[in-house]
Structures are given as C-alpha cells and as structure tokens.
Amino acid sequence: MSDGYGLLKGKKGIIFGALDERSIAWRIALACKREGADFVLSNAPIALRLGTLNALSEETNAPIIPCDVSSDDDVKDMMEKVKAELGGVDFILHAIGMSPNIRKKKEYTDINYNWYQQSLDISAISLHRILHHADEAGILNDGGSVIALSYIGAQRIFSKYSDMNDAKALLESIARNYGSRLASRGIRVNTISQAPTKTSAGSGIKGFDGMYTFAEKLAPLGNPSADDCADYCVAMFSDLTRKVTMQNLFHDGGFVTNGISEEMMEDLAKLYSEED
C-alpha cells in the first residue's frame, strides 16, 4: 500500500458496506488505512457470505463485525463490540443501499410495498439507527465526521433507479437532521452524491450502463472513480473539513451543474439525423 499524508493518523472509525474490491466502501477503507486510520468493517451477514470482505480485513488489519442494520438489537450489540475494540470513533462511513424492487425489476408505479419499506429502512433509516446507537453507546468522539454515500436521484428522477430515488432523498434528510443535533459537539454529518460508479451493486440496476455513459458525456471532468471518491472521503474525515456539515456534496465531475456538453449535442444531432 502506497504512503499517504497521514491525514487520518490516530483516528478510528467504522466502515459499513464494503462487499468486494469493486465497492466504493472497499476503496475508501484502503484510502483510510493509507492515511493512518484504524477501523472496523461491517456488513450484513448475507453480504459477508456473498462478498470477499475477509481479504480486505487482512489487508487493512481491520476486524469484521457483522451487523444487520435493520435490527435495533444488532446495531446496539455492534456498537458495544466497537466500544470494546476501539473505544471511541472519529468517523463513520455509511455505504449501504438495497432495493428488492429494483432487483426484481418492479416498475415504480407497481412496487411491492413491503420491499419498498425494506429499501427505505436499509438504505436510509439505517443511518439514523447507526447514529442513535453509536451516540447511546458513547462512542462518537467530539469533532468526528460521518459520511453517507448518496446519488443525484435524491434530487432528480432517474426512472430505473426507482424507489432508491426516494431512499436517497430520505438519507440526505436524516443526515441534515442529525447533523444539526450533533453540531454542538463538533461532529459533522454529510452526504456525498457520487457519480455513477462501476461497482457490483451498480451492475444490478437495469439501465446502469446508459446512466454511466450519459453522466460521463455530460460531466466536464468525467465520472470520478471509486478511488477518487475514496480520496474525497478521506478529506471529509480529516480535520481539514471541520466546518463542513449538513451538506449534500456532489462528487460527479460537474454533472449536476452542467447543461449539455458539445459531445452530447453532436451525438444527439447524429441520432436525430439518422431517424429522419
């Protein structure tokens, strides 16, 4: 692992959501280790069986604490284990998202409501549950930083993203709400709206390749990679951003503020001329 700058030297944290080496959370874990942090890794038991988290654990010397973030008892128990392992924590990464409706290719107007509730609970309400039980266990260190990964679907409708548009909107609202309540202790809570990224999770979304190409063509800087996102998260976990909180921070190469690119105009002109 290459040398870093020591931006997180002496800091301890929890990283939720790493599945395999393509995961954004996986790349964030590597970057945090590079910068001197110690942390625990966590994911749902079923994800641990499907993924390769043990390899990341060995590479970063980070213990794994399984946790079903939809269960109060599980999260409460996990925080006690974190307390025993690390004492307090200086940062938390929430990189958790799941939609049975998307996986089952249900249209938004015909979603299964039980699955819908699962999507909201696991992808968004889990952030509230994690912060509540971490605070209750007394492991949130003053001056800490919490980051949850979001997507522009929280503000704009991407039809194939279905109920995850709603889940990300709720996630961002929870981050703002909790951020206002933890600010008196210097604890920051933000979301990072990452561009479409080629991960195992993203590949499960119908039309993902089209979303990725669209964003790549429209963003002036192009789509940032998982490693780019990891470096951004390191900055947000560090003391260099201690006055940034309750924000949704777009990390998308300029996609959110661009109108249309020359490349896209040329592609559209060709497409429409072919149709004529």
What are these regions (language model features)?
Residues G17-I24, L30, G97-S184, Q194-K198, ...:
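Catalytic loop of short-chain dehydrogenase/reductase
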Residues T245-D276:
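Short C-terminal tail/terminal secondary-structure segment
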Residues I125, T191, D209-V244, L249-G253:
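C-terminal helical subdomain
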